Amino acid sequence: LKIKDIFEKKRLVFSFEIFPPKTTTPLERIYETLDELKGLQPDFISVTYGAGGSTRDRTPQIAMDVKNKYGIESLAHLTCVEATREDTEKIVSFLLDNGVNNILALRGDPPEGARDNFVKGDFEHAIDLVRFLREKYGETISIGGAAYPEGHIECDDPIKDLHFLKQKVNAGVDFLITQLFFDNELFYRFMERAYIAGINVPISVGIMPVVSKNQIERIVTLCGASLPQKFVRILHRYADDPRALEEAGIAYATDQIVDLIAFGVKGIHLYTMNKAHVARRITSNISTLREAVPDPKGEKVLS
């Protein structure tokens, strides 16, 4: 089943992101996480690449198992960094041969410590990868792309950033998943601009529950997400109390999701950081909202 078809059939699409363990860590660890996530009945699970494709060999394997072992639709991340057309074709062929026909096309991050000195590969930007995939595989695959409600960290012009996003959609992207954010109002303004720009593919909202002090420092460094005062107060209050910070982070993410569902978003994509217990808590918190989402006329419909 293609993810674009899931968006057409369901009022609210609920999904998770996981990442492969480092190559020094046994794969069994991620399957323990998946055992728990399966019971939460996500509509699909995405599987990331490491920086510079550092878990490249593990991503297709796990994506295949999500689909065939766990019976959950799988979205395999594919990045441009150091990727050749030949390598990309091999990966996509493996995925298609094993029932995975959903790909999230991303530029990706350079290998750690090699931001200014690495082999770029055959695709410079995500749009180049999207064009290649669509021309090569046509409608046999469903292609997702990334959207940046606060603009890409490397682009300081939001209008230009939106123009690039529109081009990416025109090149063949079927749906979008947003970068994480902590201020819903910024997202709503982004949605208004996207509508005006004619971006009409489904947009799923990326939400990351912040449950540790180190996590937020990495987030701000990597993606530049702005922190509203409400969020900053939580960090200051509970930064030195790990259990309290986790509880507050789960509550904050839940509050974001409740508001986003009320706004009428098409999807919620939870960045789990492989913490199944956090995903379970949030899923439980919004279970009633998932089961019956009000349509614009106020009537309840199954999600």
Please tell me what each predicted stretch does.
Residues 1-6, 25-27, 53-65, 84-90, ...:
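Active-site-adjacent beta->alpha loops and helix N-cap segments on the catalytic face
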Residues 17, 45, 95, 168, ...:
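Conserved, mostly hydrophobic/aromatic
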Residues 18-21, 48-52, 77-83, 108-109, ...:
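Active-site beta-loop-alpha junctions enriched in small/polar residues
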Residues 121-148, 196-250, 255, 286-303:
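Active-site pocket-lining/capping segments in soluble small-molecule metabolic enzymes
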Residues 132-177, 251-263:
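Active-site/ligand-binding-proximal alpha/beta "capping" segment
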